[in-house]
Amino acid sequence: MFDIEIDPTDAEHAMFTTGFGGWETFNLSAVEREEPVKWSIMSAGIEETVPLELYAPEKGARLISGIGDYGGFTHFDLNRPDSLGSHANPHFGNTNGVTGAWLKQDLVVRVGTLFGHQPDAKTISYSEDGGRHWTMCATVPTEKSRNGHIAVAADGSSWIWIPDRSKAYLTRDKGASWQVCRGLPKNIRVIADKVNPKRFYAVDAVAEILYSSEDGGATFHADTLNLTVKRSQRGNAGAAVRRGDLRGGQDRIYATPGREKDLWIAAYDGLYHSVTSEKFDFRVLDKVRTIYAFGFGKAKPGNDYPAIYLIGVINGQYGFFRSDDAANSWVRINDDAHQYGLVLHICGDMQEYGRVYIGTHGRGIVTGVPAS
């Protein structure tokens, strides 16, 4: 419950709000007679929807979503609800992580929190048909493992799961067994290279440390970065200060689809790109000042580099942006009348150039296409 109010003009009428919508009664005084008070939902056909993760494959479903409270959905048709409903086997309340094997597109893995009473269910599940049907993993790393984020090797051969406030765990047998990844701190987000199944990456943007693995995630090595933008990096005595919203897409590392070791660091206060084949050498993109969300989409016809989408501040202006030339130039794709409140996630459609998905905090997933 977030709030409760009694109508100042009608003592029988009261309302309270929850994440599931508003409720109201018109017989509040029944409680004084020790009789039941009848409450009814005020929403009709709508519900607060909070996307927690967006994953757009190159084939099959257009989008696979991780949702707060309702698990998530596989969106084959963007114009109508999928007949399969929310993801099952098991049903999650929250799906905090969902991703797939980039070179084996039918394999998708999700992690989250169980919904309701499912005593034998696990908090990780996978699909081998692009998100239509799901199989629970046989085990989880520890009995407390839930939520967090999942990374899947490009060929699906290994998965790395970092549950909430936990070490990173590796499985090579679809969750039948797990081992601790060596060389990683707790509670760090890991991603997979989109081409080389042996490569995984993680970044601590505040400490300026890049972690990389070349053995399929078993061992990580740390490299010190030199990120040149340092606004709002640390507070007194070196304590980390708040950098945007931890649920958003900032202070994360991203791997470019179709390109090995082509990495982006979307720091809260700057965008960095590294394409050096021998070592990690990140250069700053000067126009980007603040980042809240970052993602890729299908390349513009005639281009061989994916479109890049970003929510943040570029050249002093907040907005949703797309770049068709590897972040050298940007076009704003929204206007001041379409900002949708708190927005923490963005990704492009990998099957249709220009289509973009916006993850709002309570207003669902917004999709848009170029006006012309």
Where on the chain are the PLM-derived regions?
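Loop/turn-rich, solvent-exposed surfaces of beta-rich toroidal or solenoidal domains
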Residues: F2-H13, T17-G22, E53, G249-V275, ...
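Short glycine/acidic-enriched loop and turn motifs that connect beta-strands
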Residues: G21-W23, G71, L114-Q118, S166-K167, ...
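Conserved Ser/Thr-centered positions that define the repeating blades of beta-propeller domains
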Residues: T25-N27, G72-F76, S125-W134, A153, ...
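Beta-propeller fold detector
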Residues: E34-S43, S83-H87, T135-T139, Q179-G183, ...
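Conserved blade-ending motifs and adjacent loop-strand segments that build the rim/top face
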Residues: K38-L54, N89-N96, V229-Q233, D286-G295, ...
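Blade-level signature of beta-propeller repeat domains, shared across WD40, Kelch, NHL, RCC1
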Residues: H338-S372
